[in-house]
Every structure is written in C-alpha cells, then in structure tokens.
Design a protein with these regions (language model features):
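Terminal targeting signals and extreme-terminal segments of soluble enzymes
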Residues: 1-162
C-alpha cells in the first residue's frame, strides 16, 4: 500500500496510509456531490480522490438505460465529466472555478448493467485550462469508454454569466 510521509510538530516523520487521507477527501467530495441534483439523480458515488486523480462508480439501474437495454451514452459521458472534473479540481488553487469546455468520448463496449467504474487523471494543469482523461470500465473490468476532457479554469470569480 502506498504511504504518505508527513512531519509531526516535533519534526519527526509520521507515516499514515494514503488510503486514510483519500478516504477523508472522498467523503468531503461525496457530501458536495449530494448537493448537486443531477449527480444525486444519477447516483454517482466516490471511490477515491487524490491529487490529479479521481475514481467514481455507479450501479446501473433501469433509469440509466436507453431503449436497447444498455447504459445511455449521455450517462457515461456525465460519469466521465463528473469524475474528471473532481480530478481537475484537485490540481487547481482554492477558489478556482472550472467548467467543461470540451469533452470527446469513444464508446468501446456496450454496458448492459452492473457496477461501472470511472478512473480519471489529469494530463496537464495550465493557467487557464486543465486537460484530463477518463476511462470507464464495465463490471467485467473491460474498458467500455474513454474520454478526453478539457476544463476552463478561472480564479477568484464565478463562471456564471451576468
């Protein structure tokens, strides 16, 4: 297991697992996502969050499926967007707002059901943009979709139009 080293107030090294630290961050993110009605409706949940990375999951339900009995592509895109956004937020200064400016997704396998998992990582954080990728896996562990996302980043003010 990966370990994070931290200095105590006495200057000695204190070893804590990265898993414990990310569990705390994941719980904070989970609470914020519950406030978002769209995410709450989709029932997207957090597995882990660390700097530049996020892993989310979703249990497929009938409301996620299109008429052919597989998960709708827009649902997979929403899962990728949400997961990648949290990974992006983890790399920008506090008070920075981000918004998706581009999302490209390739659907590789149909997803008929089960638990799907999204893994996002930041490829580059610049002054105005954050570029990420997100892979979505079906219950069997096969990659079902791959997305490349770019987020615009603005420090200190809201992205809402006046």
């Amino acid at each position: 297991m990966k370990r994070a080293r931290m200095r105590t107030s006495a200057g000695r090294k204190d070893v804590r697992t990265a898993k414990t630290e990310t569990a705390h961050v994941a719980e904070e993110v989970r609470a914020r996502l519950r406030e978002n009605e769209a995410i709450a409706h989709l029932e997207i949940d957090v597995e882990s969050v660390s700097k530049g990375r996020a892993v989310f999951f979703m249990e497929v339900q009938s409301k996620h499926k299109q008429m052919h009995g597989v998960v709708h592509g827009g649902i997979l895109a929403s899962l990728a967007d949400t997961t990648a956004a949290i990974a992006a937020y983890s790399t920008v200064p506090a008070g920075t707002h981000i918004a998706t400016v581009e999302l490209k997704i390739n659907y590789l396998e149909p997803v008929p059901g089960g638990r799907i998992r999204a893994e996002a990582r930041v490829l580059r954080t610049g002054r105005n943009f954050v570029v990420t990728e997100c892979e979505i896996y079906n219950e069997s562990g096969e990659m079902a979709a791959k997305a490349l996302l770019t987020f615009g980043a603005t420090a200190g003010h809201s992205l809402e139009r006046a």
